[in-house]
Regions:
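Accessory nucleic acid-recognition modules appended to NTPase machines
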Residues: 1-142
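Active-site beta-strand-loop-beta-strand hairpin of nuclease catalytic cores
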Residues: 142-150
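Short, glycine/charged-rich beta-strand-loop motifs at protein surfaces that mediate ligand recognition
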Residues: 104-106, 150-155
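A short local loop/turn or secondary-structure capping micro-motif enriched for an aromatic residue
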Residues: 66, 146, 158-161
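Catalytic cores of nucleic-acid endonucleases
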Residues: 155-189
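Hydrophobic/aromatic beta-strand patches that form the interior of the parallel beta-sheet core
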Residues: 81, 128, 151, 175-179
């Protein structure tokens, strides 16, 4: 479906805000980043258009991680990732040298998280993230059959994650996943 001129300006504004949205400590989508005084009423249809077109990946917040996970989605809270991490790299203006070295840049965490979102979506997973009363946040929560799986993404080799520990303690999943630059390993808990 083609968008009107007025709608296309809102769509573009939402799309252009994604690097800034992901650069924040709290990556939850905020309409005020798109435009001062922005709201779901003003930009909600634009975000839906981008999502349905496959240009962005919408990751809904859940406050509980039980099967079926979709019924625990908070439709008012979400993150938006670019549908292609290469587009995020280009839109953010981060240099190739910084990406290749992977060091000393806080935006590398956003790129890494976007890459994981893209790969999970390509494998057919619906994207959710978990937040516990604003004290802990887990990057992704997946449902595979009847299993709920927590996924924590770390940009470097520092792998300590209080959020993943809180998630595991609360929900006792069969397993959880921590992605980082460290070599693959398996550990109880």
């Amino acid at each position: 479906k083609y968008a009107s001129n007025a709608d296309s300006m809102k769509i573009r504004a939402c799309y252009n805000s994604i690097p800034a949205q992901l650069a924040k400590d709290n990556k939850k989508f905020q309409y005020k980043v798109v435009q001062k005084g922005g709201s779901a009423t003003l930009f909600g249809a634009s975000i839906e258009w981008l999502n349905l077109a496959g240009v962005v990946l919408k990751c809904q917040r859940i406050n509980q991680a039980f099967e079926p996970i979709a019924v625990y989605a908070d439709l008012s809270a979400f993150k938006l990732y670019m549908g292609d991490v290469g587009l995020l790299t280009m839109k953010s203006g981060i240099s190739q040298q910084t990406v290749l070295s992977g060091e000393g840049n806080t935006f590398m965490g956003a790129l890494t998280e976007n890459y994981v979102a893209q790969q999970l979506a390509a494998k057919g997973y619906d994207l959710y993230y978990w937040e516990s009363s604003s004290t802990a946040e887990l990057d992704f929560v997946l449902q595979k059959g009847s299993q709920i799986i927590g996924v924590e993404v770390k940009k470097g080799e520092h792998v300590r994650s209080r959020s993943l520990s809180v998630f595991v303690s609360n929900y006792k999943p069969a397993y959880s996943i921590r992605l980082s630059l460290k070599n693959f390993g398996e550990k109880d808990g």
